[in-house]
UniProtKB/Swiss-Prot annotation:
Changing R74A: Slight decrease in binding affinity for Kv. Keywords: Disulfide bond, Ion channel impairing toxin, Neurotoxin, Potassium channel impairing toxin, Secreted, Signal, Toxin, Voltage-gated potassium channel impairing toxin. It comes from Dendroaspis polylepis polylepis. This is Kunitz-type serine protease inhibitor homolog dendrotoxin K. GO terms for molecular function: potassium channel regulator activity; serine-type endopeptidase inhibitor activity; toxin activity. Serine protease inhibitor homolog that selectively blocks voltage-gated potassium channels homooligomer Kv1.1/KCNA1 (EC(50)=0.6 nM) and Kv1.1-containing heterooligomer. Residues 27-77 form the BPTI/Kunitz inhibitor domain. One of its GO terms (cellular component) is extracellular space.
Length: 79
């Protein structure tokens, strides 16, 4: 019972940390800050440079290539 619980916990952790197969699709999207006026510190993945870079998100619009932290960007797009 204890081993089964440990295995279940490890599988859950693995599932949470493994990037989704569709992630690369939106990592290739161009930077879109959106049309609104706010300046929310965010990160996007620059496909050609193969790196996560900072930008100020406007608060609306944009696309899925937008992350709250550089760690989230790297985990999703860099691997």
């Amino acid at each position: 019972s204890g081993h089964l619980l440990l295995l279940l916990g490890l599988l859950t952790l693995w599932a949470e940390l493994t990037p989704v197969s569709g992630a690369a699709k939106y990592c290739k999207l161009p930077l879109r800050i959106g049309p609104c006026k706010r300046k929310i510190p965010s990160f996007y993945y620059k496909w050609k440079a193969k790196q996560c870079l900072p930008f100020d998100y406007s608060g609306c619009g944009g696309n899925a290539n937008r992350f709250k932290t550089i760690e989230e960007c790297r985990r999703t797009c860099v691997g």
